[in-house]
Each structure stands twice: as C-alpha cells, then as structure tokens.
Design a protein with these regions (language model features):
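Metallocofactor- and cofactor-centric catalytic cores in central/energy metabolism, strongly enriched
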Residues: 1-151
Length: 151
C-alpha cells in the first residue's frame, strides 16, 4: 500500500496560511485586505500571480503592455487565480541619457527582489525589447518560480 502524495502548497501560503507563524499571518492578511481581497480568498488555496509590468509612457517598445495587462488580469481571475500587477524599472534605449545599458541590470535586480520578497506563486512577464526580455527571464530563473513571457 502506498501513501498518497502530499498536496502541493502554494508559495504564498507561507504568508497567508502559516499556523507556525500566526502573528505574521494575521498581519499579512490584514495588509492585503486593503487591496480588496477577502481572508477567504487569501487563505483559500488560490494561486497569487504577479504581473511584471514593463509598459509605461517612458518605454515605447513596451507601451502596448499597459493595455494588454487588463486582459491578463481578467484571464488570471477567470482561471481562479489572484492577479497582482507591479511596475518594473522603465527602460528605453533611445530616450535615456547618457545610456540605458545599466538599466537591464537594475530591472533584473529589482524584479528579483519583488519575486523573492512578495507572496507570488507565479508571474507573467511583459517583455518587448533587448533589455526587458533578458532582465525578466533572468529574474524568474533566479527566483525559480513559474513564469510565462508575454511579448
């Protein structure tokens, strides 16, 4: 007779459903209630999916993502997840002086910190140029969470 495998817990449950750290769990839940989530949503086993937003008015090659992300949010919700969108350091090669060459590394480092430090179970990476693509892919690989790239 074999024992059934343990059910896989989402990474975010360390924040929102951790009986070994009830005080911090209560604090995290209280903070995220400000987003309009319910305690039931946060503790209900739904995956929390980050949306790494590279689109902005400062980044023309990624500007389309500002509109596309609305559909991504709707898709995550329809699939039973909880979407959380956050910005990434903007990069535009031709608009920044003296150079945008260091921006890829800044975007990478800041994204690693967000992916590691927040209760995200996966991430949608919005990419669109030779700086955001490697920055986002390297960050997701570094943190080792499920990721999909939208270009």
């Amino acid at each position: 007779m074999t024992t059934p495998p343990k059910s896989r817990r989402f990474r975010s449950q360390a924040w929102f459903d951790n009986p070994d750290n009830a005080d911090m769990t209560a604090l995290y839940i209280e903070r995220y209630l400000n987003y309009g989530f319910t305690q039931g949503e946060l503790q209900g086993g739904k995956p929390i999916i980050g949306i790494a937003q590279t689109g902005s008015d400062l980044s023309p090659c990624n500007r389309a993502h500002v509109d596309w992300v609305r559909r991504v949010r709707d898709g995550i919700t329809a699939a039973g997840g909880i979407p959380l969108e956050f910005p990434i350091h903007p990069i535009q090669e031709t608009g920044k002086r003296p150079t945008a060459s260091i921006d890829r590394n800044l975007a990478y480092l800041s994204l690693v910190e967000v992916l590691h430090g927040y209760p995200l179970d996966g991430v949608v990476l919005t990419i669109g140029c030779d700086k955001t693509t490697p920055a986002c892919l390297m960050a997701a690989a570094t943190v080792d969470i499920p990721a999909i790239a939208l270009s």
